[in-house]
Amino acid sequence: MFQVQTAGTRTGTSSPDTTTSEAGLGSTPPMPDFDKQSYWHQRFESETAFEWLIPSSTFMPLLEAFLNKLPGSDARILHLGFGTSDLQVQLRTRGFVNITNVDYEPLAIERGRHLEMTAFGDVTMQYITADATNLASVPEISSQKYHLVVDKSTADAISCAGDDAVLAMAQGIHRSLADDGVWISVSYSAFRYDSPQLPFDVEVIARIPTAKARATDPDIYHYCYLLRPKPKV
């Protein structure tokens, strides 16, 4: 179980994509193509459950203060890049009934629907196959305004396609948020949302230490971000 520490700064960090291998063990292997649909299709052919960075049971307490501020159980929640996580199940268990789950890969849709059916005996949440960098092209999303958007390392995967892809995702979320809506994002990067072009005011609301194999290993954190939309122009 990870210990969660609140934090107001982004200092004192390293991230998985910048960690070098130990001396004598060779260079770090290349990163997978996390931004490619083909990668996720191949992965989800065999994977049925996986939690990126932190378990949903760790993420939910970080969301609690924001869930309590939502207008009611029918508040609109957008869950981007749900993959094979069970976060949407935990949100429904919490009592929310208007949850839209979006993923790039159709196999994730099958996994998500099956998981919900197994947990509740029915499927009431919405599942949409879509590119999170092009939300405006999805009528089911662009016609709605969401009170809460959540992602767990989806922006990290999209960042493999470059900063413009992350900005496109952020702009789509900005357009999709209700006036009082917020975006909560978990990332391994202390600099994921540093772009001055980002249409959000950004705050780190928690640092989550990663597990260490040895006591002498460096401290590595994951970051939970609160992104509040800047005024729409």
Curated annotation (Swiss-Prot):
The protein's name: Methyltransferase srdJ
Low complexity compositional bias, start-end: 9-21
Function text: Methyltransferase; part of the gene cluster that mediates the biosynthesis of sordarial, a salicylic aldehyde structurally related to the phytotoxin pyriculol. The most interesting aspect of this pathway is formation of an aromatic product from the highly reducing polyketide synthase srdA. SrdA synthesizes a reduced polyketide chain from one molecule of acetyl-CoA and five molecules of malonyl-CoA. The polyketide chain is then reductively released as an aldehyde.
Statement: the UniProt record of this protein carries the keyword Methyltransferase: yes
Family: Belongs to the methyltransferase superfamily.
GO molecular function: methyltransferase activity
Alphabetical UniProt keywords: Methyltransferase, S-adenosyl-L-methionine, Transferase
Binding site residues for S-adenosyl-L-methionine: W40, W52, G81
Organism of origin: Neurospora crassa (strain ATCC 24698 / 74-OR23-1A / CBS 708.71 / DSM 1257 / FGSC 987)
EC number: 2.1.1.-
Spans annotated as Disordered: 1-32
PANTHER family per record: METHYLTRANSFERASE DOMAIN-CONTAINING PROTEIN (PTHR12176:SF84), SAM-DEPENDENT METHYLTRANSFERASE SUPERFAMILY PROTEIN (PTHR12176)
Motif mapping: Required for methyltransferase activity: 140-146
GO annotation (BP), single: methylation
Keyword S-adenosyl-L-methionine annotated: yes
Induction: Expression is up-regulated during sexual development. Expression is also up-regulated during confrontation with the arthropod fungivore Drosophila melanogaster.
SUPFAM superfamilies to which the protein is assigned, alphabetical: S-adenosyl-L-methionine-dependent methyltransferases
Top enzyme category: transferase
Lineage of source species: Eukaryota, Fungi, Dikarya, Ascomycota, Pezizomycotina
